[in-house]
Structures are given as C-alpha cells and as structure tokens.
C-alpha cells in the first residue's frame, strides 16, 4: 500500500507563508526547522503505527475512549472528595480546576490558532483494529494529554503519594492517542507540556489561597 503524507500539514503551511513573505532574505532557519519537525513528527507517527503489538490494540483503544471528557480524572477526584478527608477534597477541587483551565486554553485559543488537521490514518498505516472515533476538532495540541497532565500535576502537588501513579496514567493516555491514530506525537507532547504548566500554576494558586484562609482563621 502506498503511504501518503497528510495533506497540508500545519508546519508546512507556516513554512510556506514565511518563505512567501520574506523570500530568500527571510528566516530560512525557522522554515527549515518547521519542515524538519513536521517530517520527524510524521515519521514517529508511522513508527508507532507499525509497532507489532496487537495485544495492545484493545487495551489502548479502551484507554483512549475512556479518557474522553476527562472521565478518569473526574472519577479520581470524586473518590478523593468522598474518602480523602479535607486534604483529599482540596486536591480534588484543585485537580478539577486545573482541568477546567487547561481545557479552555487548549480547546479555544490554541486549537483555533493551530488549525492542524487530524492524521490520515488510512494513508499512514494505522491498523483499523486500533481506531477510535476521530474527533472533529483540530489536532494540535492534544486536549486529552493536556487535561491528564494538568490533573496529575495539580493533584500530585497536594498529595505527593499520587504523583507517580497519576503521571504514569497520564503518559499512558497520551501514548494511546498516538497509538490509536488520532494525534501526531507533537500534539501530545505539546498538550502535556501545557498541562504541566497550567496544572502547576493552578496548584500554586490553590496553595496560596489555602494559606491565606489558614492565616485569616
């Protein structure tokens, strides 16, 4: 089967715009970097698609689907709120707030600005047994990866014993999005990076608010 690159990738569009605007005197290094990154991104995507791991198809497909609408993280937050005492409730609220902030930033300004098209799974060789529903939103950045990372960082800051398991779970979700073919690797890396930053900021704000309440009481 002949494999074709996805049509009109965003990094190629940006590179073409820079070349058209500045010509030979333009930022040639930036143009080269954009095209190189896009090429590497698609090569890694293909490499994941070609992994001989059929035993992972069903588990990772289910992980990817279950992570829709941040269901795992809301479930963890509910358990913490119900059984984690005062500290667990604070961690749950902080984690949910981090998801809210991150989801807004990723799904509004970032996806609208990026306009990256979703991968062409058929052309890029992703086995149909791995497929989940292809979202209609822009591909860059990954909202699933962003929310997972934000929740893990925010809750992990309040409850350090959960830091490793939550971040591990977030990594599995991020990988599942590439494995099932709905995101390029750069999408999940960017999403996770945004989630780490916003999750950390949310945790800091929550800690300061808690400290102020403690002083005032």
Feature map (PLM): residue ranges:
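Alpha-helical transmembrane segments of multipass membrane proteins
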Residues: 98, 102, 106-107, 195-203
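Membrane-embedded catalytic cores of phosphoryl/pyrophosphoryl-handling enzymes
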Residues: 126-217
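Membrane-water interface at transmembrane helix exits
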Residues: 80, 106, 110-115, 156, ...
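Acidic (Asp/Glu-rich) catalytic motifs at the cytosolic membrane interface
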Residues: 106-117, 180-190
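Interfacial segments of alpha-helical transmembrane regions
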Residues: 80-105
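N-terminal transmembrane-helix/juxtamembrane module of multi-pass inner/ER membrane proteins
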Residues: 2-74, 107-137
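Hydrophobic/aromatic residues in alpha-helical transmembrane segments
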Residues: 75, 105-106, 151, 168
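Membrane-helix interface segments
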Residues: 55-56, 87-91, 120, 159-165
């Amino acid at each position: 089967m002949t494999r074709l690159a996805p049509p009109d990738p965003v990094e190629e569009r940006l590179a073409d715009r820079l070349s058209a605007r500045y010509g030979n005197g333009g930022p040639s290094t930036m143009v080269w970097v954009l095209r190189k990154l896009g090429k590497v991104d698609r090569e890694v995507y293909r490499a994941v698609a070609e992994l001989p791991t059929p035993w992972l198809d069903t588990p990772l497909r289910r992980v990817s689907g279950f992570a829709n609408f941040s269901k795992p993280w809301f479930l963890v937050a509910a358990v913490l709120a119900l059984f984690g005492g005062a500290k667990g409730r604070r961690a749950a609220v902080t984690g949910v707030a981090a998801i809210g902030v991150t989801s807004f930033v990723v799904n509004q300004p970032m996806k609208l600005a990026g306009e990256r098209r979703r991968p062409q799974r058929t052309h890029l060789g992703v086995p149909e047994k791995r497929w989940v529903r292809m979202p209609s939103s822009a591909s860059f950045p990954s909202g699933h990866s962003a929310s997972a990372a934000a929740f893990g960082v925010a809750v992990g800051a309040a409850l350090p014993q959960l830091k490793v398991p939550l971040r591990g779970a977030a990594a599995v979700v991020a990988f599942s999005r590439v494995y099932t073919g709905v995101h390029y690797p750069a999408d999940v890396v960017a999403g996770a990076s945004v989630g780490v930053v916003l999750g950390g900021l949310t945790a800091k704000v929550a800690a300061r608010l808690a400290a102020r309440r403690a002083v005032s009481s």
